[in-house]
Amino acid sequence: MSISDNNMSGRSHDPEQIDLIDLLMQLWRGKVTIIICIVVAIALAVGYLAVAKEKWTSIAIVTQPDAGQLASYNNAMDVLFGANAPEMTDVQAGFIGRFSSAFSALAETLDNQQEPEKLSIDAAVKGQTLPLKVSYTGKTSEEAQKTLAQYIQQVDEGVAKELNADLSMSMETRLADLQKSLAAQEAVAKEQKTLRIAQMTQALKVAQQSNIKLPQVQQVDQVSQDSMFMLGSEALSSMVENEATRPLTFSDQYYQTRQNLLEVQALEVAPDSVHAYRYVMKPTLPIRRDSPKKAITLVLAVLIGGMIGAGVVLGRNALRGYKAKAE
């Protein structure tokens, strides 16, 4: 037996061996079926593209506000807390931190709606806390851009309102403390005046009883409380009258407290002047939609249609071959 005979014998004894040429010929003969399946798949894909909801994503990048955006707020903090006021960098970090937390809370709320909305916030650069990338997915590119800008403004206004409310509360507390301090210092000054008048009146009585009319000492600073009567009744009488009509005497601390009170009362922070963020990149107008992807959908339709058509052709031929063997 020749080698060719052995090969033919081996091929005839292996019925499960795949003949690629025969397989291709089967597919070619069933090309009409395959083409029909592809056309049907493309038609279904076109129908899907026509009814599927489009998704467009607008992106913005924000970071902490500039010092100029917080000038009035920072000035108010300096007036309220003086040397204990927080640094500008801490104020900026606090604002953007509140913005990030509020934005995340809003995104979670929108996601839990009956009709969820996709709003997100993440670090723009991996491994860095700032800047922040915020995005919104809408039905059209214009809607996505407009809605993202609205949500950023909404969060910014909310944060500014909260921080201004905290500032107003701090102002009220500071005013109350300063007013109490002034009242206490005024009470002390009144007590000191009353005490001085009482001491002078007592010295006047002693001088009158001792019949001392003229001063008996050369220098007034040498007179103590016990020897004040030595100033004489005439001088003491004038001193009592002058002390009674003289305004209260206050220390430098009183006037500093008074100045602080007036500065706090004059504080006024306009809510519109405070912002919790600064744009690095404003909301974009997307030019490519996220889904459905027309090109990818049509390519997949052709591939899936072709695979289904090929499966139909090969399956039909295999069934015919099985029936022929059975007969």
Swiss-Prot record:
Ranges facing Cytoplasmic side: 1-31, 316-327
Which Pfam families does the record match to this protein? Answer: Wzz
Q: Where are the transmembrane segments?
A: 32-52, 295-315
Q: In which pathway does it act?
A: Bacterial outer membrane biogenesis; lipopolysaccharide biosynthesis
* Name under which the protein is recorded: Chain length determinant protein
What are the record keywords, sorted? Cell inner membrane, Cell membrane, Lipopolysaccharide biosynthesis, Membrane, Transmembrane, Transmembrane helix
- Family classification: Belongs to the WzzB/Cld/Rol family.
Q: Among its keywords, does the record have Transmembrane helix?
A: yes
Where is it found, in Gene Ontology cellular component terms?
plasma membrane
Stated role: Confers a modal distribution of chain length on the O-antigen component of lipopolysaccharide (LPS). Gives rise to a reduced number of short chain molecules and increases in numbers of longer molecules, with a modal value of 13 (in strain O111/M92) and of 17 (in strain K12).
- Could you tell me where this protein is found in the cell? Cell inner membrane
Under Gene Ontology molecular function, one entry of this record is: protein tyrosine kinase activity
Instruction: Please name the source species.
Output: Escherichia coli O111:H-
Topology within the bilayer: Multi-pass membrane protein
One biological process term in Gene Ontology: lipopolysaccharide biosynthetic process
Taken from the record's topology, the Periplasmic segments are 53-294
Record's superkingdom?
Bacteria
